[in-house]
């Protein structure tokens, strides 16, 4: 082996401990950036048509929130409580219809129905576009969660965030264009790039979100929701000057190798380019994630300082800061919405943790003039059954559930679609996950049929051969 090349590889091994995940996972394939900055894979790209939104914040509620207890008001479900469930044949046996466990009321000028679980979010009713006719293919968490993010229930495919970044690039070359805050454990498919270049996959911030775990257990098993940091963003072995000297020396070795006619490995050159960008990110990422400079009023707005809302409040505030810094796509995961039992206590706890921070995010974005350009999305992988499971729970329901959008060019104070009288199945303007993906891309200025990537001899797209845009919800 060429001695010079061997030395270069040694340098790469030592520097990788400081840049870690951030350098390799989020910043690969940067070979062309320095030679031709305009050709860099993350440089802003022209959309297919005029976008209504420039950024996305996806508030992902893992576990499947109960739509009939939150945003899908069903008077007949209340009237027929205790009767045998008409759609509960087979696996459900003699299940009984269970009414919503909280009262519903109308809010805003639009008169939008929302349950009492949302006292803060209800103040923003006229900003919300309720998608009451969502549907997906399977009532199983792993498959449905994968489909929510990638459009497929089983194959390894690029995620929604990766497709968005691939199609549009990002505004800040010193930050990742796709950030996922506290993604679930063992769920890299949900933020991965699959066959797209690795530069487009999400950069993970923190560990999985498991609300309700004691802090010690959270840190031990989940990384803790409060541990929202980028792994290895700082090099504990070398200061900035020493790192800069390392990179300069590696570049010098590159030049020496080229002058000797030995050539330069494209893979090694790409990694070095990643290091260069990661080096710049060391200064920018901590600044964006530093919440100490926020006013006390802003922290209080998000519920920071309150044990119940502290963690999710910090994450929502961090999302706003990433938006301000030019990041294209941010996802925040909040887990444990799978109430097969303990619905009353569990769903109330979940909503208490997210209601105030989500309302604060909408208010803060609007006050800063950012909401009009930012599409905020809330929802999970499917919904829950209108009938009971056990004494105090609801089972999975993939045929009809609710998500909502706000800002980013959607009509506020609107309910789109409808489920049947009990909330089992979408019966009007059904929005399958493929339709939802097509609509999100359209709001960002991307045609889901034209956003393709050629791999293994065929053109792939997020929506495969499906998907219709819900233009009725667009402002």
What feature does the model see in each segment?
Residues 1-475:
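Ligand-binding pockets and gating/stacking loops
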